[in-house]
Each structure stands twice: as C-alpha cells, then as structure tokens.
Amino acid sequence: RAQLLAFRDGNRVDPLMNATMKGLSDQELESLAQHFSSLVPKVSSIVDKPNQAGMNIRARCISCHGMQGKTVNDQWPNISGQKKGYLQKQLKAFRDGSRHSEVMAVIVKDFTDQQIEDVSEYYSQQSH
C-alpha cells in the first residue's frame, strides 16, 4: 500500500505507475494492495547452488529482509524470488539517489555494479 500511495502522490517516480495511480482513492489503493499482496509470485529460477558472492553480500540485507529475502517486518518488502533486473534497477536507484530511502542509500552507496548484480541474482533465486 505504501508504495502505491507513494506513486499516486508523486513521492516515488515512475511515469507509468504515477499515471496509473493518479486519481485513485485510498480505498481503491487499499483494494489493489490487498489483491497484489495475495498473489503468489513466481520464482525466477531456484538453483541448488546460489550465487556465492551474492550470498556473502546479503549480510548487509538480512536485518530488514531476512536470510532469504523474507522480511521480518511489514515495513520492508519481501525480495525473495523477485526478478533480478528489477532488484538491480532498484538498488542502483537507491545508490544514485533517484529513489529515496536514507537506510537503503547508506547500505548500497559503496556497492559496485557487480555486487548489485550478485546480490540481485542471489535473492532472485530464493523461494518464497
């Protein structure tokens, strides 16, 4: 719900999502959030041996997102099984400041593109 609200109110920028959410009521946003929260996501590809470099990098992620990308608090998203490309895009946006989160900016500020790729691959391979 928080992310849909951020798109609607212009606090998170994505031209398609901003246009889609514009004009929706709080109740409509809540209904959308409940619908999407109830869906079972498909995992990109579960592997027997996950990306080792990504596994090492996840140490910076587990306090909020859990060992395998399953959040420990409803304030933070589950990232297990999320698409690798999406995770990469979001981590780079936090790193370069085009997506705002003080916590995430501090965590990823020194990540290289390779580290972002590795940790994104690791979490994309985790089951829900």
Predicted regions and their residues:
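Interaction-mediating elements
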Residues: D14, Q34, S101, Q114, ...
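Acidic/polar helix N-cap motif
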Residues: S25-E28, P50, T112-Q115
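Short pre-active-site segment immediately N-terminal to redox-active cysteine/selenocysteine motifs
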Residues: E28, I57-R60, Q68, K83, ...
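The canonical Cys-X-X-Cys-His
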Residues: L32, F36, A59-Q68, V119
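C-terminal functional regions that serve as terminal interaction/effector modules
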Residues: Y86, I107-V108, D113-S127
